[in-house]
Amino acid sequence: MRTYKLTIAYDGTRYQGWQRQANTDRTIQGILEKIISEAVQYPVEVNGSGRTDAGVHASGQTASVVLPGAVEEGFFTDYVNGKLPHDIRICKANLMKNGFHARKSAAWKIYEYCIDTGMKPDVFRRRYCYHFPCEPDLEAMRKAAGYLK
């Protein structure tokens, strides 16, 4: 068995989050599993380092998939990417030691939030930034963030 670590980027606007769901095909995990399963001609499970909600984007989410044998270099980044929708990409694929699991092996995660403080929403960043047309109270935000540790 071969375990691969996938680094994935996606624009989650059109999707119902990461986790596969019985009532929709519009999840990142579900689409990855469908495309990879079709490519290797047997069912696979893609495990994410965490779940995202509907509409959430990721620029470097880690996932893992176990295949019974090695695949050619470029299988994920060329072949699978060629079958994925334009808003989901496998940026990198690495062969890992058996036992690697994206969620269980995760040491840390980074969450980034974008706040647009302009008077009007930025036309190019409107899908990726929360529009708040005031200066935020940075000290209060720092204090609140301290409670998350």
Please place each PLM-identified region on the residue numbering.
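Structured-RNA-binding interfaces characteristic of tRNA pseudouridine synthases
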Residues: 1-149
